A protein has these predicted regions:
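ABC ATPase "signature
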Residues: 217-218
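Catalytic Walker B motif of ABC-type/P-loop ATPase nucleotide-binding domains
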Residues: 158-162
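Conserved ABC ATPase "signature" region
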Residues: 83, 102, 106-129
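Conserved ABC transporter NBD signature motif
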Residues: 62-73, 77-78
Length: 272
């Protein structure tokens, strides 16, 4: 590991494409077994830093280590220590969920591929859908399967590049629960996102990347301290759309029974 004990450490990372500077002197450090959210709008450089840390792209300047290995001098060791999940689930839709996992385990030359597949299916609540073709899975199920596949071989570090892009609210919550479980099992997670609520829900630490630079880095509590105290006035709280959605759907949305136990909104006739 690095001297600081960090699972991921980057110092002075710079990257330009032609005359456009994408990353400008980026520093970051991620402790072992934590979730670190890199927050920023499209084009901020989030995917570029992930590519550099996962050895897919060389920086123009700076140094980085992942799981104790330098990404420039020991790229093979870095790749053995990580898993990368991109913005869209990289699963074979023709195969079943279990077949996808078994295939990945065999590609990684892991023993007991079938048992590992069954364990991961149970861990990510996919056992009932194990033999179904992935083409029939919902977006949330596909993403959970994708994350499960990334755990084969027990990599200590996982990069999740905008893992909930294109998912509906219920599917996003399913993925959030899976990500929280990863950290609970000791896996280090670097998560990129442009969703503020996602970073707030998941991250132990949050860094904001803007125009290629880290402009703030800290815990949620530390970031809140950057703002002046809010003036408190009594306002009757109205439920948000998210409150309504979660109250109606809850966990029942996973099996298609959403709303069976929820109160229905009154019709115009009932209102009269």
């Amino acid at each position: 590991m690095t001297q600081s004990g960090a699972a991921i450490a980057a110092r002075g990372i710079r990257k330009s494409f032609v005359e456009h500077t994408v990353l400008d002197d980026v520093d970051l450090e991620v402790d072992q077994g934590t979730i670190f959210a890199l927050l920023g709008p499209n084009g901020a450089g989030k995917t570029t830093i992930v590519k550099i840390l996962s050895t897919l792209l060389r920086p123009d300047a700076g140094t980085a280590t992942v799981a104790g290995f330098d990404v420039a001098t020991h790229p093979a060791d870095v790749r053995e220590s990580i898993s990368l999940t991109g913005q869209f689930a990289a699963v074979d839709e023709i195969l079943s969920g279990r077949e996808n996992l078994v295939l990945m385990a065999r590609l990684r030359r892991v023993k007991d591929a079938g048992q590992i597949a069954d364990d991961l299916l149970a861990r990510f609540q996919l056992t009932d859908a194990a033999t179904r073709r992935v083409a029939t899975y919902s977006g949330g199920m596909r993403r959970r399967l994708d994350i499960a596949m990334s755990l084969i071989g027990n990599p200590p570090v996982i990069f999740l590049d905008e893992p909930t892009t294109g998912l509906d609210p219920q599917a996003r919550i399913e993925v959030w629960n899976s990500v929280k479980e990863l950290a609970g099992q000791g896996t280090t997670v670097l998560l990129t996102t442009q969703y503020l609520d996602e970073a707030e829900q998941l991250a132990d630490r949050i860094a904001i990347l803007h125009e290629g630079r880290i402009i703030v880095n800290g815990t949620l509590a530390e970031l809140k301290q950057l703002l002046p105290p809010a003036k408190v006035e009594y306002v009757e709280k109205q439920p948000t759309l998210e409150d309504i959605f979660l109250a109606i759907v809850g966990t029942a949305g996973k099996d298609g029974n959403a709303g069976n136990e929820a109160a229905s909104a009154p019709t115009s006739k009932e209102q009269r």
